[in-house]
């Protein structure tokens, strides 16, 4: 076990930030004391929806762009292109606006149109891709995502763009290894026993798990998937049209998770995720989406079983 050598939490009250990207990360950690008062244990919620783009994806967006600049893969004036369910695109729109790159977000029509409007307001070009004929409107499936991938690949070739690929680029995982993980340890006074995360690209789960396991191998880390879309766990995959956006894409292998040792897989139903999201708002004043609800629902399952009496951390994104 090792301790972080110095604080990684930025005290933004001590200086004027040069631009909005300086406000990414160092988000608050809050105990869900009202929500979990009948639970045997604690749930600590990392409020990453307080990032400038309202999600944890701001961290990955910034790190991917910084890495690409450093390596020379991204040159001044080059167009940045990436597929998104909304959050990654918003983060990239912010970072590209500040650092001077045109940005194209490619998005399924099954995703939130509010996010598309937000990205356009920040200067992004948004390309919307129709869902498959047998898809449920508003519920993005694996085949829907493949359509978005195909359009993204074509646009990168046509525009000579830089693909800010959150599924492949190491910056996604590194953002959470260098930021979210150390912040969780420091803010919790090293009291975390477990961590669980709803998996989209896998970057958050991979980066946080890698840091926590290096810090203390006894900390248990879990992947969260939708009930019936359990590709990582090798379980059922007969419900691709679940309502938990941002993950559950039926991808059994994710680059970010290669070599990452997980302690288990948790499945959460639509109704469990939705109910937890509603209760977060009603009981804790935390207004978040269904993926955040899935994280909290999974943490509750752990506290009612193998991790009773422990402290579980989640990200509210």
Where does each model-flagged region fall?
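PLP-dependent amino-acid enzyme catalytic core
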Residues: 1-317
């Amino acid at each position: 076990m090792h301790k972080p050598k110095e604080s990684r939490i930025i005290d933004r009250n001590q200086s004027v930030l040069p631009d909005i990207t300086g406000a990414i990360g160092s988000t608050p950690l809050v105990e869900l004391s009202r929500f979990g008062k009948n639970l045997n244990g604690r749930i600590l919620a990392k409020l990453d929806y307080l990032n400038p783009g309202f999600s944890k994806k701001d961290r990955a967006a910034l790190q991917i762009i910084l890495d690409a600049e450093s390596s020379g893969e991204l040159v001044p004036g080059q167009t940045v292109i990436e597929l998104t369910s909304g959050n990654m695109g918003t983060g990239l729109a912010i970072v590209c606006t500040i650092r001077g790159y045109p940005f194209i977000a490619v998005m399924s029509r099954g995703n939130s149109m509010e996010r598309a409007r937000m990205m356009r307001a920040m200067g992004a070009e948004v390309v919307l891709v129709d869902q498959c004929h047998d898809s449920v409107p508003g519920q993005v499936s694996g085949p829907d995502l493949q359509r978005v991938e195909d359009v993204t690949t074509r646009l990168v070739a046509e525009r000579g763009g830089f693909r800010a690929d959150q599924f492949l680029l190491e910056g996604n995982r590194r953002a959470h290894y260098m930021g979210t993980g150390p912040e969780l340890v420091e803010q919790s006074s090293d009291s975390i026993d477990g961590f669980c995360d709803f998996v989209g690209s896998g970057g958050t789960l991979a980066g946080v798990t890698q840091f926590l396991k290096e810090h203390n191998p006894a900390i248990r880390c879990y992947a969260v998937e939708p009930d019936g879309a359990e590709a990582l766990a090798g379980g059922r995959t007969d419900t691709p049209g679940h309502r938990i956006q941002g993950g559950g894409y039926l991808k059994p292998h994710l680059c970010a998770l290669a070599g990452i040792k997980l302690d288990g897989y948790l499945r959460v139903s639509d109704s469990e995720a939705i109910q937890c999201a509603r209760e977060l708002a009603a009981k804790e004043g935390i207004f978040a989406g269904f993926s955040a609800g899935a994280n909290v629902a999974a943490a509750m399952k752990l506290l009612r079983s193998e991790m009773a009496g422990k402290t579980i951390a989640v990200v509210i994104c």
